[in-house]
Amino acid sequence: MNTIGPHGEGAFEKRHVGEEEFLLVLDELVAALRANGAPFAFIGGIASAVMGRPRPTLDMDVMVRPWEAGAVLRALGDAGFETQETFPHWLFKAARRDVVADVIFLSTGDIHLDDEMLARVLRRAFMGRMLPIVAPEDLLVMKALAHSEETPRYWYDGLSLVARSDLDWDYLLRRARHGPRCVLSFLLFARTAGLVVPAGAVRSLRRLVATGRLAA
């Protein structure tokens, strides 16, 4: 296992690689994760490409349970990846042949791969491979909460999820408890873009923001 301390450079810098190389490393990543046995699901650019809008991505974002992140990183190291405990409270990295995988175990709003999210994980095709992908509702909430000046693409990824996915609005509202103000702001933004957002969902989020309870 080749582990590097926090904030190391070199192998963990994101670089443009060819599609063939990217997919080869993806296959190796998935094989190592499946051999380890801990549940995982893809988020980030791969999930957005599957369920929303295709866009270029330089890395792979995979979510694991917080208490299994260390074992997952060790398994990737044993499989030949260079590994890094980048931010020990939420993010590790693994790299191979100039392709970086972000191993995320805590997202903005204290979102983690809990039982509710795991129960909704989907198997979807990506570039000829069947991968576990988080549900579009979970991805949308994560995109809404992680939006910043440096990552405006996250909300545009979210717009594509509203436009292209048949969302379970009741489930989305339950997951919105991690950041109801951000999710409400995003859904109002989606309306300005001409997308259909149920009025009941907006009312429920306004109530959640105001009172801490969802509308009946």
Question: Which stretches of residues belong to each language-model region?
Answer:
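Compositionally biased terminal segments of proteins
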Residues: 1-216
